UniProtKB/Swiss-Prot annotation:
Residue stretches spanning the membrane: 5-25
Domain of life of the native organism: Eukaryota
GO CC list: chloroplast thylakoid membrane; photosystem II
Record's protein name: Photosystem II reaction center protein M
Record keyword Ribosomal protein present: no
Subcellular location: Plastid, Chloroplast thylakoid membrane
InterPro entries reported for this sequence: PSII_PsbM, PSII_PsbM_sf
A biological process from GO: photosynthesis, light reaction
Species annotation: Panax ginseng (Korean ginseng)
UniProt topology in membrane: Single-pass membrane protein
Keywords in alphabetical order: Chloroplast, Membrane, Photosynthesis, Photosystem II, Plastid, Reaction center, Thylakoid, Transmembrane, Transmembrane helix
Oligomeric and partner information: PSII is composed of 1 copy each of membrane proteins PsbA, PsbB, PsbC, PsbD, PsbE, PsbF, PsbH, PsbI, PsbJ, PsbK, PsbL, PsbM, PsbT, PsbX, PsbY, PsbZ, Psb30/Ycf12, at least 3 peripheral proteins of the oxygen-evolving complex and a large number of cofactors. It forms dimeric complexes.
Length: 36
């Protein structure tokens, strides 16, 4: 089975970018909640 590298990279970015974005928001809100 041949895998298109560009398609694999695009899929990885499509999954990782929103996940990292949500994690950053989550960490920021958690740190703010701990300070308050």
């Amino acid at each position: 089975m041949e895998v298109n590298i560009l398609a694999f990279i695009a899929t990885a970015l499509f999954i990782l970018v929103p996940t990292a974005f949500l994690l950053i928001i989550y960490v920021k809100t958690e740190s703010q909640n701990k300070k308050n």
